[in-house]
Each structure stands twice: as C-alpha cells, then as structure tokens.
From Swiss-Prot:
InterPro entries: Pyridox_Oxase, Pyridox_Oxase_CS, Pyridox_Oxase_N, Pyridoxamine_oxidase_dimer_C, Split_barrel_FMN-bd. PANTHER family: PYRIDOXINE-5'-PHOSPHATE OXIDASE, PYRIDOXINE-5-PHOSPHATE OXIDASE. Its EC number is 1.4.3.5. FMN binds at residues 61-66, 76-77, 82-83, 105, 140-141, 185, 195. Keywords: Flavoprotein, FMN, Oxidoreductase, Pyridoxine biosynthesis. This is Pyridoxine/pyridoxamine 5'-phosphate oxidase. The gene is pdxH. The keyword Oxidoreductase applies. Pathway: Cofactor metabolism; pyridoxal 5'-phosphate salvage; pyridoxal 5'-phosphate from pyridoxamine 5'-phosphate: step 1/1; Cofactor metabolism; pyridoxal 5'-phosphate salvage; pyridoxal 5'-phosphate from pyridoxine 5'-phosphate: step 1/1. It is an enzyme of class 1 (oxidoreductase). Substrate binds at R8, R9, E10, Y11, K66, Y123, R127, S131, R191, L192, H193. Catalyzes the oxidation of either pyridoxine 5'-phosphate (PNP) or pyridoxamine 5'-phosphate (PMP) into pyridoxal 5'-phosphate (PLP).
Length: 212
C-alpha cells in the first residue's frame, strides 16, 4: 500500500464569515465563479456530477457547467449516456466544484430536470461545428472495439455535414439541476475550515454553519 499520509498543506487564503453571506446562495456562487475565472483556474466550470443507478451504486464524472441562474445549474449530454439513463430512473444528483488553488469547494444537491428541445437547440447551435459533429458520432458509454472506429465515424459524418448546418441529434439534450442545498467550503488555518450550508425551505434559504 502506498502511504500518502505526509502529503498536506496549510490553508491561508482567508475565511468566510456569516455576516458576509448573501441570503441567496446563487449570488455567492456567482461571486465565487467570477473569482475562480479571474484567478485563471484550469477549467473553473468543470464540475463532478454524481448519479446513482438502480442498485444504489453511485457514479461520478466531470461535466462542464454551461449556465446558471436563480433556477439552477445547466449542463448538456448524450441522452443515451450512463448519466442520462440513471437520471431517468432517479433524478436526484450531486454537483461538486473543486477549486483547490483558491482553497474553495462548492457542493450542490438537487434534482435534474430535462431541458426543452428549444433550449437544447439554442445551445447546440453555439457549439463549434466539429463539436456538433462529435455529438452525432459517439454513442456515449457504449463499448468500442478500437479508437479507429470512432475516428472513422467522425470523418464520415464530417463529410456528410460538410455543407450547411449540423442538425440537433434527437439523442442529445440537457438538464437543469434545481438545487435543494448548496454548501460553500473555504479552507481555514489549523484545519478550522469554514463551511456554510444553504438549505431550500419553501421559498427561502436557511443558512447554517457546519463544523469542519
């Protein structure tokens, strides 16, 4: 067994105080996302999306956040993917943003709701053409005999869609994750980290400080 117990560091970038918190967690998330981008973090919109299968087995993968507002968090995916199939069975999901360089994390619990075709198409048309073509090529989460099969299909579809717009695949869509709770974690000195949990109750958010 590899011993990693000596790998540690101190957290020195400051704390998070109750008096500084807005009542709406999306305002704090927007501020933290802006600061993560300004800090030029690698992939600040990358989030871990956790789902659960019918046997209770959890799965995780990294997905890019594409939009957020007071209603929730939006991402897009192949509707035949493992995550989409699991969401169809159990739409309770968890999102996690690990912004280690600025000593912050955000953890979100909520329910994923499918976006309308109009909303999906609006985003799909903003993607680079090669990305649109790639959406047609990959049967996400299915087994492949070799990478060459995938590449061959890509160039085949690229020739097919050489002229004009690439149509939206019927098996490609997106989700709005409506949060029921959002936790903000700020690293603190002596491992006394600051954690604040926003919990949705009716039409308001209740804020609690959690022990680190």
């Amino acid at each position: 067994m590899t011993d990693l117990s000596d790998i540690r560091r101190e957290y020195t970038k400051g704390g998070l105080r109750r008096a500084d918190l807005p009542q709406n967690p999306m305002q704090l998330f927007e501020l933290w996302m802006t600061q993560a981008r300004d800090a030029e973090l690698s992939d600040p919109t990358a989030m871990c999306v956790a789902t659960v299968d019918e046997h209770g087995q959890p799965y995780q993968r990294i997905v890019l956040l594409k939009r957020f507002d007071d209603t929730g968090f939006v991402f897009f995916t192949n509707l035949g993917s493992r995550k989409a199939q699991q969401i169809a069975t159990n739409n309770k999901v968890s999102l996690h943003f690990p912004w280690h360089p600025i000593e912050r994390q955000v953890s979100i619990l909520g329910e994923a709701q499918p976006l309308s075709t109009a909303e999906v198409l609006k985003y799909f048309m903003t993607r680079p053409k090669d990305s649109q073509i790639a959406a047609w090529v990959s049967q996400q989460s299915s087994k492949l005999s070799a990478r060459q099969v995938l590449e061959g299909k890509f160039f085949e579809m690229k020739a097919k869609f050489a002229k004009g717009d690439v149509p939206l695949p019927s098996f490609w869509g997106g989700y709005l994750v409506k949060p029921s709770s959002i936790e903000f974690w700020q690293g603190g000195e002596h491992r006394l980290h600051d954690r604040f949990l926003y919990t949705r109750q009716a039409d308001e958010w209740v804020i609690d400080r959690l022990a680190p």
